[in-house]
Amino acid sequence: MENIMNHGFIKVAAATPKIKVGDCSYNAKEICRLMDEVYEKGAQFVVFPELCITGYTCSDLFWQSTMLVAAKHGLRTIAEHSEGMEIIAIVGLPYIYGGKLYNVAAIIYNGEIQGMVPKSYLPNYSEFYEARHFTSGKDLESIYCEESDCGFSFGTNLIFKLSLIHISEPTRLDVI
Protein backbone atom coordinates (compact mmCIF):
# COMPACT_ATOMS: atom_id res chain seq x y z
CA MET A 1 0.00 0.00 0.00
CA GLU A 2 1.34 3.41 -0.96
CA ASN A 3 2.05 5.86 1.84
CA ILE A 4 -0.11 8.98 1.43
CA MET A 5 2.65 11.09 3.04
CA ASN A 6 4.53 10.74 -0.25
CA HIS A 7 1.82 12.97 -1.75
CA GLY A 8 1.85 15.54 1.04
CA PHE A 9 -1.09 14.13 2.99
CA ILE A 10 -1.30 12.69 6.47
CA LYS A 11 -4.05 10.55 7.96
CA VAL A 12 -5.75 12.32 10.88
CA ALA A 13 -8.07 10.62 13.36
CA ALA A 14 -10.51 12.06 15.87
CA ALA A 15 -11.12 9.67 18.75
CA THR A 16 -13.60 9.90 21.61
CA PRO A 17 -12.78 7.65 24.56
CA LYS A 18 -15.44 6.24 26.85
CA ILE A 19 -14.32 7.92 30.05
CA LYS A 20 -15.17 7.85 33.74
CA VAL A 21 -15.44 11.37 35.14
CA GLY A 22 -12.60 11.99 37.57
CA ASP A 23 -10.86 8.64 36.94
CA CYS A 24 -7.71 9.88 35.22
CA SER A 25 -5.94 6.51 35.34
CA TYR A 26 -8.81 4.72 33.61
CA ASN A 27 -9.21 7.52 31.08
CA ALA A 28 -5.49 7.52 30.24
CA LYS A 29 -5.61 3.77 29.58
CA GLU A 30 -8.64 4.22 27.32
CA ILE A 31 -6.86 7.02 25.44
CA CYS A 32 -3.80 4.77 24.99
CA ARG A 33 -6.02 1.96 23.70
CA LEU A 34 -7.62 4.26 21.12
CA MET A 35 -4.23 5.69 20.16
CA ASP A 36 -3.05 2.14 19.42
CA GLU A 37 -6.20 1.46 17.41
CA VAL A 38 -5.91 4.50 15.14
CA TYR A 39 -2.14 4.04 14.81
CA GLU A 40 -2.67 0.47 13.58
CA LYS A 41 -5.05 1.89 10.97
CA GLY A 42 -2.35 4.25 9.69
CA ALA A 43 -3.20 7.51 11.46
CA GLN A 44 -0.26 9.82 12.01
CA PHE A 45 -2.18 12.43 14.00
CA VAL A 46 -4.95 11.84 16.55
CA VAL A 47 -7.07 14.41 18.34
CA PHE A 48 -9.00 13.67 21.53
CA PRO A 49 -11.71 15.84 23.18
CA GLU A 50 -10.95 18.68 25.55
CA LEU A 51 -10.50 17.62 29.16
CA CYS A 52 -10.58 13.95 28.12
CA ILE A 53 -8.11 12.95 30.84
CA THR A 54 -10.40 14.15 33.66
CA GLY A 55 -13.78 14.47 32.01
CA TYR A 56 -15.44 17.77 31.14
CA THR A 57 -17.93 17.88 34.03
CA CYS A 58 -15.60 17.83 37.05
CA SER A 59 -16.64 21.38 38.04
CA ASP A 60 -15.04 22.37 41.37
CA LEU A 61 -12.97 19.17 41.38
CA PHE A 62 -10.74 20.81 38.75
CA TRP A 63 -9.18 22.83 41.61
CA GLN A 64 -8.48 19.80 43.82
CA SER A 65 -4.77 18.97 44.00
CA THR A 66 -5.57 15.24 43.90
CA MET A 67 -7.35 15.72 40.56
CA LEU A 68 -4.58 17.90 39.11
CA VAL A 69 -1.85 15.43 40.13
CA ALA A 70 -3.86 12.53 38.69
CA ALA A 71 -4.36 14.46 35.42
CA LYS A 72 -0.59 15.08 35.13
CA HIS A 73 0.09 11.43 35.86
CA GLY A 74 -2.43 10.44 33.17
CA LEU A 75 -0.70 12.75 30.71
CA ARG A 76 2.68 11.20 31.49
CA THR A 77 1.19 7.71 31.07
CA ILE A 78 -0.08 8.66 27.60
CA ALA A 79 3.22 10.30 26.66
CA GLU A 80 5.23 7.25 27.77
CA HIS A 81 2.86 5.00 25.86
CA SER A 82 3.51 6.97 22.66
CA GLU A 83 7.26 6.37 22.76
CA GLY A 84 8.42 4.75 19.54
CA MET A 85 5.14 5.52 17.78
CA GLU A 86 5.12 7.82 14.78
CA ILE A 87 1.92 9.57 15.81
CA ILE A 88 1.15 13.02 17.15
CA ALA A 89 -1.56 13.01 19.81
CA ILE A 90 -3.48 15.93 21.27
CA VAL A 91 -5.25 15.36 24.59
CA GLY A 92 -7.05 17.70 26.99
CA LEU A 93 -6.55 18.28 30.69
CA PRO A 94 -6.66 20.98 33.37
CA TYR A 95 -3.24 22.50 34.12
CA ILE A 96 -2.10 25.11 36.63
CA TYR A 97 0.48 27.66 35.56
CA GLY A 98 1.33 30.80 37.51
CA GLY A 99 -1.40 30.06 40.05
CA LYS A 100 -4.08 30.04 37.36
CA LEU A 101 -6.02 27.05 36.07
CA TYR A 102 -6.10 26.51 32.31
CA ASN A 103 -8.03 24.12 30.08
CA VAL A 104 -5.19 22.93 27.84
CA ALA A 105 -4.56 20.79 24.80
CA ALA A 106 -1.32 18.87 25.32
CA ILE A 107 0.69 17.89 22.26
CA ILE A 108 2.43 14.51 22.61
CA TYR A 109 4.91 12.94 20.24
CA ASN A 110 7.29 9.99 20.58
CA GLY A 111 7.16 9.72 24.35
CA GLU A 112 7.40 13.42 25.11
CA ILE A 113 5.09 16.29 25.94
CA GLN A 114 5.95 18.79 23.22
CA GLY A 115 3.77 21.61 24.52
CA MET A 116 0.47 22.77 25.93
CA VAL A 117 -1.95 25.25 24.39
CA PRO A 118 -4.48 26.84 26.77
CA LYS A 119 -8.01 27.42 25.54
CA SER A 120 -8.53 31.07 24.59
CA TYR A 121 -12.28 31.46 24.34
CA LEU A 122 -14.18 30.13 27.33
CA PRO A 123 -17.95 29.76 26.98
CA ASN A 124 -19.96 31.07 29.93
CA TYR A 125 -23.62 30.59 29.01
CA SER A 126 -26.33 27.95 29.32
CA GLU A 127 -24.72 24.81 30.71
CA PHE A 128 -21.16 26.05 30.14
CA TYR A 129 -19.39 27.62 33.12
CA GLU A 130 -15.80 27.42 31.97
CA ALA A 131 -14.96 30.99 33.01
CA ARG A 132 -15.83 30.00 36.59
CA HIS A 133 -13.04 27.43 36.66
CA PHE A 134 -10.52 28.30 33.96
CA THR A 135 -8.46 31.28 32.87
CA SER A 136 -8.39 32.24 29.20
CA GLY A 137 -5.04 31.81 27.50
CA LYS A 138 -5.86 34.60 25.04
CA ASP A 139 -3.40 37.15 26.47
CA LEU A 140 -0.83 34.68 27.78
CA GLU A 141 2.75 35.03 26.55
CA SER A 142 4.24 31.82 25.18
CA ILE A 143 6.93 30.49 27.50
CA TYR A 144 8.97 27.37 28.14
CA CYS A 145 7.87 25.45 31.27
CA GLU A 146 10.26 23.36 33.31
CA GLU A 147 8.60 20.50 35.15
CA SER A 148 10.54 18.23 37.50
CA ASP A 149 10.97 15.59 34.81
CA CYS A 150 10.40 17.43 31.52
CA GLY A 151 10.17 20.77 29.81
CA PHE A 152 7.68 21.96 27.21
CA SER A 153 6.36 25.05 25.48
CA PHE A 154 3.23 26.65 26.93
CA GLY A 155 1.11 29.29 25.21
CA THR A 156 -1.31 30.01 22.40
CA ASN A 157 1.18 30.93 19.69
CA LEU A 158 3.34 27.81 19.41
CA ILE A 159 4.90 26.17 16.38
CA PHE A 160 6.26 22.63 16.67
CA LYS A 161 8.72 21.11 14.23
CA LEU A 162 8.27 17.35 14.39
CA SER A 163 9.84 14.80 12.07
CA LEU A 164 7.74 11.89 10.88
CA ILE A 165 10.51 9.46 10.00
CA HIS A 166 8.65 6.29 9.04
CA ILE A 167 8.10 7.43 5.46
CA SER A 168 10.54 6.99 2.59
CA GLU A 169 11.72 10.61 2.79
CA PRO A 170 11.73 12.27 6.23
CA THR A 171 9.14 15.03 6.29
CA ARG A 172 8.98 18.01 8.61
CA LEU A 173 5.51 18.75 9.89
CA ASP A 174 4.75 22.18 11.28
CA VAL A 175 1.95 21.99 13.84
CA ILE A 176 0.51 25.40 14.64
Give the predicted meaning of each segment.
Residues 36-146:
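Cys-nucleophile CN-hydrolase/nitrilase-fold catalytic domain and related Cys-dependent amidase chemistry
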Residues 143-163:
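Accessory alpha-helical/coil subdomains and C-terminal extensions
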Residues 23, 56-57, 176:
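Active-site-proximal flexible loops/turns
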Residues 1-42:
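N-terminal active-site segment of His-dependent metallophosphoesterases
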Residues 2, 12, 124, 162-165:
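Extended interaction regions within the primary functional domain
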Residues 165-176:
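Single conserved hydrophobic/aromatic residue that forms the stacking wall/gate
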